[in-house]
Amino acid sequence: MMRTGEIHRVTGETDVQVRLNLDGSGQCQASTGVAFLDHMLQQISSHGLIDLEISARGDTHIDDHHTNEDVGIAVGQALAQALGDRRGIHRFGHFLAPLDEALVQVALDCSGRPHLSYSLSIPSQKIGTYDTELVKEFFVAVVNNSGLTLHIRQLDGANSHHIVEACFKAFARALRQATEIDPRRADAVPSSKGVLEQAGMN
């Protein structure tokens, strides 16, 4: 069974295309017009072993907000599509990622119930030209459109780039753990209720 998602989202502000394969090898082609976001998407792909093809055109002459958010929306929708009814997955994932002095913990549940708890404390307002407040907005968009319950905790860190990159690496590894197939669960839905809510169906 191919666990893939493909989304083409067009608004008056952006045109975003996402192709995602949960059972990939970490191949990534990201061209969003936002260089730092491309770099973080590469972390998700590489450390999550998710194949990603993402292209976006947006009103970055104004700022990166709309592109950042709409890429997050499309990634979340593609993830929900790839997971389907979430049959056979581990469901839960957790990872603690160090990057030099930075240490970030991520725990997530492919529950179908979107929730974000976020406690990064990023010292600088920008990394290059990227507004660091957009990190949270990206994850809000992913969570709301994928049905993830996501907790992000910063345990240490002083360098803004290190903190954010550790966050994306931890997210990637936790997502990989949660979405991998559990051979002991076979075709069962990982819930005592026998069903998990699907994003957009709550």
UniProtKB/Swiss-Prot annotation:
Annotated compartments: Cytoplasm
Class of this enzyme: lyase
Keyword annotations: Amino-acid biosynthesis, Cytoplasm, Histidine biosynthesis, Lyase
EC number assigned by the record: 4.2.1.19
GO molecular function annotations of the record: imidazoleglycerol-phosphate dehydratase activity
Pathway membership, UniProt: Amino-acid biosynthesis; L-histidine biosynthesis; L-histidine from 5-phospho-alpha-D-ribose 1-diphosphate: step 6/9
Gene Ontology cellular-component annotations: cytoplasm
GO terms of biological process kind: L-histidine biosynthetic process
Family per record: Belongs to the imidazoleglycerol-phosphate dehydratase family.
HAMAP family in alphabetical order: HisB
Protein known as: Imidazoleglycerol-phosphate dehydratase
Gene: hisB
